[in-house]
């Protein structure tokens, strides 16, 4: 499970710039709950051997009691609670402020691993950049410059050191290939808990906590129609006697970790609310993670024909990048439409692990090129020579040839469609990688 790092500090110390450096992306999952005046942003990153999740927060005033500052303080406390380690960001140029003392006192009481990052330290004399911040009494300190990218790797190493993470090269996870690891993802109140409790009740599940670190999500083993599953908690599973029941407790971190840990993700939408920004964010994360996915539109019984048509258009427009996924219309509370969902989950898992032989892929490639050649780019016309499988879950197809950097995205989509049809790939992303042969005369006149 990826460790979680929370960025905490008063306003304008450079937390967002640091967030962008640590994640190397402008994209983020946003906890856009109704009524929030300041969102928490979540992003993936990897500096060094370990991947991690970073939470960016607003300016923190621990003692704020009214208005926007109270809400921002609550958001920051939630981020800290979700995290494994805190990076406390201060302004090396401005020096210590009263707010810094308040935040340091708050963090010290929590006892959570904390690293102090003195940001904006570029150009300051070495040795004076962090010296005064020793007064805050928070242990490890480092002078960094988020805007210049200075000290980023060392900062991550310091932050993750207390967690004693295993070496990724040595970390081996024994998985039963016969078990499908399933995560039910979705916004708050779309019906995840209702659906999961329906399954729990139907299957009379006996649950247990799988061994692992304290960051591991609770997993529930069960069997449906002879197929073994492992349900990964995203809805706040709570033990009730010998079984678990789900409560509607939304956690972005738990959702991201569950998606990463799953073989198949069931993305639940609310028919009464349409496709929201957060639905699209979660769907994008599922695609980015390469997970097989099934879409289920809950509360279908609560909308009329006109609303259903609008919803279908919304799915096509906002979730068009998941057009390979099966869509089901269900009512979790009435237990309607749930049977076909299981069939699609199993089909998506099988597609994600489909083996594709090199001869068949190469024949398919030649037929595709014969039917429609790639577009010429200036004097270059890409030549596609052969293809082979480069991985599974998600399936990866590697195509070799010449001048492949001139292959258009539309042509890649054309090839993807041919491959999907040939191998019946439903419910899984398909990644196509193009590898051009080296031209020995490229740099010679």
From Swiss-Prot:
Q: Which residues form the KH-like domain?
A: 354-438
CDD domains in the record: EngA1, EngA2
Amino acids binding GTP 2: 186-193, 233-237, 298-301
**UniProt: GTP 1 binding residues:** 9-16, 56-60, 119-122
Keyword Magnesium on entry: no
Q: Which GO terms describe its molecular function?
A: GTP binding; ribosome binding
Please indicate which superkingdom the organism of origin belongs to: Bacteria
- UniProt domain EngA-type G: residue ranges: 3-167, 180-353
Pfam families in UniProt:
KH_dom-like, MMR_HSR1
User: What keyword terms does UniProt attach to this protein?
Assistant: GTP-binding, Nucleotide-binding, Repeat, Ribosome biogenesis
Matching entries from InterPro entries are given as: G_ENGA (IPR031166), GTP-bd (IPR006073), GTPase_Der (IPR016484), KH_dom-like (IPR032859), KH_dom-like_a/b (IPR015946), P-loop_NTPase (IPR027417), Small_GTP-bd (IPR005225)
GO terms for biological process? ribosome biogenesis
Report the protein's function: GTPase that plays an essential role in the late steps of ribosome biogenesis.
Question: Subunit details for this protein?
Answer: Associates with the 50S ribosomal subunit.
Query: NCBIfam families, alphabetically?
Result: GTPase_EngA (TIGR03594), small_GTP (TIGR00231)
User: Family, per the entry?
Assistant: Belongs to the TRAFAC class TrmE-Era-EngA-EngB-Septin-like GTPase superfamily. EngA (Der) GTPase family.
This one is known as GTPase Der
**Which source organism?**
Polaromonas naphthalenivorans (strain CJ2)
